Curated annotation (Swiss-Prot):
It comes from Campylobacter lari (strain RM2100 / D67 / ATCC BAA-1060). It catalyses: tRNA(Cys) + L-cysteine + ATP = L-cysteinyl-tRNA(Cys) + AMP + diphosphate. This is Cysteine--tRNA ligase. Binds 1 zinc ion per subunit. Keywords: Aminoacyl-tRNA synthetase, ATP-binding, Cytoplasm, Ligase, Metal-binding, Nucleotide-binding, Protein biosynthesis, Zinc. The keyword Protein biosynthesis applies. Its cofactor is Zn(2+). It is an enzyme of class 6 (ligase). Its EC number is 6.1.1.16. The gene is cysS. One of its GO terms (molecular function) is zinc ion binding. A motif ('KMSKS' region) lies at residues 259-263.
Length: 460
């Protein structure tokens, strides 16, 4: 199993601290607003990584944090008149709803920064004791001149990154960063009341959960500098070892070729996409581009991803399979193992999805020729369950999948028309029955007569 290490800039064999055990930390959201597509991509990419490791026989401990104290949250407090907890709890709940829609496995740890304040204070006290930090009027800062390997993680240079550095005229070095911001409204500490800086929040949560055994630190490429650089700097100088064995980063999400960002005004919320397509379609779409590549969002590509996922559900429907349960599955089929082998090369999702397409097509051809082969159908069901777990798809009831986007009121109206059609057929009024079917077809509602009754689905 190899992954592209963002620090070494090459593919490296994955060697964890302990054999067949992977400890992963993913930088989560700052909870002051709803999740956007950038959050979705990072979550899907590294949930996929987690699934591949689990399917490959690894024990995985996965942590994804919440930054629940931050300048953006404080600004939201001022604008809304709500408390810190009211805002953060509200957006955490909404974020987790979005993650469930995307079939993101529940993290083993979901640390909130505010739950680790005491550990952060102790951490900063140690940095001061080691003369790695210093005090200014507005807070405590890390002295980056004490780190001979600063810029090791990001491979950046100071001249190219001035715009991303924290401003303070009194800093010893331009690259120095804040560990603690003085503020009388917040937490008491030996060095003065205040609140922690973002970079200290994450490194303390990582060390509290994983000690010195973090195998993979993951996140969006936009976090590489200064956030991940500054996390690593603190750990390296305080503990004399690197924060993580591997650094994995996913590429930007772009809208019409431009990086998605609120400052450019081209950012939109995940919930907006989930109104148009179910979460599995969006997940499948996000997996279609290699995690390290930049992802250009386009509605026509999302629609193409739906048609591709439809084929998976059509095969499930052909076998009369119910919604699968999302649980770890032992990989036994040759098809699943071949796909895993491809994914073990830096999560080569595009090649893996091509193999999935090929498998679905071949399965349909075989079933056309051998419709009564029960042994094949049993094995096919098992393989589909394995693939569902690996890709994180197939957990929606098949009928509901093809009815997505139809309101409850409209569903009731359709069912009433089906009842009228059934009555018309019983009375041998086939003209009326056909008229009802054709009228629904004009509304992109397709009726299908099956041995178990009439089923319907949305066309397109």
């Amino acid at each position: 199993m190899v992954f592209f290490d963002s620090v070494l800039k090459k593919k490296c064999e994955f060697i964890p601290h302990e054999a067949k055990k992977a400890n992963i930390y993913l930088c989560g959201p700052t909870v002051y607003d709803d999740a956007h597509l950038g959050h979705a991509r990072s979550s899907v990419c590294f949930d996929f990584l987690r699934r591949v490791l689990l399917a490959s026989g690894y024990e995985v401990v996965f942590a994804r944090n919440y930054t629940d104290i931050d300048d953006k949250i404080l600004k939201k407090m001022q604008e809304s008149g709500k408390s810190l907890k009211e805002i953060t709890n509200f957006y955490i709940k909404r974020y987790e709803e979005d993650m469930q829609a995307l079939n993101i496995l529940e993290p083993d740890f979901k640390p909130k920064a505010t739950a680790y304040i005491e550990q952060m204070i102790t951490y900063i006290e140690k940095l001061l004791e080691l003369n790695l930090a210093y005090k200014l009027e507005d807070g405590i800062y890390f002295d980056t001149s004490k780190d001979d390997k600063y810029f090791y993680i990001s491979k950046r240079n100071l001249e190219d990154n001035q715009s991303r550095l924290e401003e303070s005229v009194a800093k010893k070095n331009d690259s120095d960063f804040v560990l603690w911001k003085f503020d009388e409204k917040f937490y008491p500490a030996s060095f003065g009341k205040g609140r922690p800086g973002w970079h200290t929040e994450c490194v303390v949560m990582i060390e509290s959960i994983f000690k010195d055994k973090l195998d993979i630190h993951a996140g969006g490429i936009d976090l590489l500098f200064p956030h991940h650089e500054n996390e690593a700097c603190q750990c390296r100088c305080k503990n004399n070892h690197e924060l993580a064995n591997f650094w994995l980063h996913n590429g930007f999400v772009q809208i019409n070729g431009e990086k998605m960002s609120k400052s450019l005004g081209n950012s939109f919320f995940l919930k907006d996409s989930l109104k148009l397509f179910n979460g599995e379609v969006l997940r499948f779409y996000l997996l279609s581009v290699h995690y390290r590549a930049h992802f250009n969002y386009a509605l026509e590509d999302l629609q193409a991803a739906k048609k591709r996922l439809d084929k998976f559900y059509r095969l499930k429907k052909r076998l009369n399979l119910n919604a699968f349960i999302d649980e770890k599955t032992i990989i036994e089929s040759k098809v699943s193992q071949n796909i895993l082998d491809v994914l073990n090369d830096d999560l080569n999702a595009s090649k893996a999805l091509a193999l999935l397409d090929e498998f679905i097509n071949e399965s349909n051809i075989y079933l056309d020729q051998n419709p009564k082969d029960k042994a094949y159908k049993i094995q096919l069901e098992k393989t589909l369950k394995e693939l569902s777990f690996i890709f994180g798809i197939g957990f929606i009831d098949t009928i509901k999948y093809f009815q997505f986007g139809i309101s409850e009121e409209k569903c009731q109206e359709i069912e009433e028309k089906i009842t009228l059609r059934n009555k018309a057929k019983q009375e041998k009024n086939y003209v009326l029955a056909d008229q009802i079917r054709d009228d629904l077809a004009k509304e992109n509602i397709l009726l299908m007569d099956t041995p178990n009754g009439v089923v319907w689905e949305k066309n397109g």
